[in-house]
Design a protein with these regions (language model features):
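Hydrophobic alpha-helical transmembrane segments of multi-pass integral membrane proteins
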Residues: 2-179
């Protein structure tokens, strides 16, 4: 070529390696874009919950509304910022980072939507904890963190990315603190 580079011609008959059908289905995700990658729904719900949670807390704290909380308003606010907002943010980060660390496909579609629903169920359970009882609320709330931890461990181990198993320490601390 004129620029001193060699021209490389590829054969038009090159065929990509066969992709197992299960991976091809997951790679060609055609569902809602919101559930294509973990950061999308979890960063969204974290942002929304941080605003809604603060508004509810301020109104509850000043007696403008009465939420059926099984704890005082300040404890509820602290709990929701840690186990609602922070947990959703960590979930969004991990579900986006782990595929990059492991080379595996991201958790998406109905499995990701299921995790989001577990997170939402935890928020509702804590919000209604005076009605459903503290034990039931705690059980529902911690189920999200347990599910997230199991997904994270499964993906990290399947990808043989042992050095990133240390992120599990953060999830274990959150789980233990939430029990």
């Amino acid at each position: 070529s004129r620029l001193g580079r060699k021209s490389v011609m590829t054969s038009p008959m090159t065929v990509p390696a066969a992709i197992p059908p299960a991976l091809a289905r997951r790679r060609d995700y055609a569902g809602p874009a919101l559930f294509a990658y973990g950061f999308r729904p979890f960063f969204l719900v974290a942002a929304l919950w941080s605003a809604v949670g603060i508004l509810l807390w301020v109104r509850q704290y000043f007696g403008e509304i009465s939420l059926p909380l099984g704890m005082n308003a300040l404890d509820w606010h602290i709990h929701e910022m840690l186990y609602g907002y922070v947990a959703a943010t960590i979930a969004g980060f991990l579900l986006t980072a782990i595929p990059n660390w492991t080379g595996r496909l991201p958790v998406n579609g109905w499995r990701l939507a299921g995790l989001v629903l577990l997170w939402l169920a935890g928020r509702a359970a804590i919000l209604l904890s005076a009605n459903i009882g503290g034990f039931a609320a705690a059980l529902v709330d911690v189920s999200f963190l347990l599910a997230l931890a199991s997904v994270a461990v499964r993906e990290i181990v399947a990808g043989k990315n042992w050095r990133n198993l240390r992120v599990m320490v953060v999830l274990v601390v959150l789980i233990l603190g939430n029990i």
